[in-house]
Amino acid sequence: MYRLDDEYSKKAKREGYLARSVYKLIEINEKFSLFSSGNVLDIGASPGSFSQYAYKKLKRGILVSVDINDIGLRYDDNFYFIKGDIFLDDTVFKINTFKPYSLVISDVAPKTTGNRLVDTSNSFNLSMRIIDLSLEVLLKKGNLLVKVFQGGDEMQIFKKFEKYFKFVKKIRPKAVRKNSFEIYFLGKSFGK
């Protein structure tokens, strides 16, 4: 969905991306080189712009996109979509079918209530689930990028990143809306 009064929304529409959020991933990748050879997992893929970019950057691997909602992407080769909830065993089983992954990306956010305390708590739980799942499926030296809401227990998430990754960074890309309290945590080189 595009708000045409926004420069990133206009650019996304012009360039054929499904959402403006892609520019967050593009900026982070240009600074930190996330992609390498191997499979890529996109958790919370809807509406699909992260997957669009990841598919373009894919190097000798498969892109697996997961979401509870359908996404409007279909590629003939090296792409698999899983409609499911990452808290359910059946979905995790399907994700594991394609492991190991060299990169896990997630721009997922919980359904927001408008109550910042509730929203940050839900974001924390979702982020921790994504990290735990990533620890099971990442290739040694793999990378993880997760969106987190600030204002809760995000430092616990950051400490977990520090425990498992050689390089850890907190990032607020330029494309994040001014009034948003989202940031991204990047972990590079899993397994120290």
UniProtKB/Swiss-Prot annotation:
Keywords (A to Z) from UniProt: Cytoplasm, Methyltransferase, rRNA processing, S-adenosyl-L-methionine, Transferase
Top enzyme category: transferase
EC code: 2.1.1.166
GO cellular component: cytoplasm
GO MF annotation list: rRNA (uridine-2'-O-)-methyltransferase activity
Catalyzed reactions per annotation: uridine(2552) in 23S rRNA + S-adenosyl-L-methionine = 2'-O-methyluridine(2552) in 23S rRNA + S-adenosyl-L-homocysteine + H(+)
Annotated InterPro entries: RNA_methyltr_RlmE, RNA_MeTrfase_FtsJ_dom, rRNA-MeTfrase_E, SAM-dependent_MTases_sf
Active site (catalytic residues): K147
Residues given in the record as S-adenosyl-L-methionine binding sites: G48, F50, D67, D85, D107
Principal location: cytoplasm
Family matches, as SUPFAM superfamilies: S-adenosyl-L-methionine-dependent methyltransferases
Domain of life, source organism: Bacteria
Pfam families named in the record: FtsJ
Keyword rRNA processing: yes
Subcellular compartments: Cytoplasm
Protein task: Specifically methylates the uridine in position 2552 of 23S rRNA at the 2'-O position of the ribose in the fully assembled 50S ribosomal subunit.
Family, as annotated: Belongs to the class I-like SAM-binding methyltransferase superfamily. RNA methyltransferase RlmE family.
Protein name per UniProt: Ribosomal RNA large subunit methyltransferase E
Biological source species: Borreliella burgdorferi (strain ZS7)
Chain's gene name: rlmE
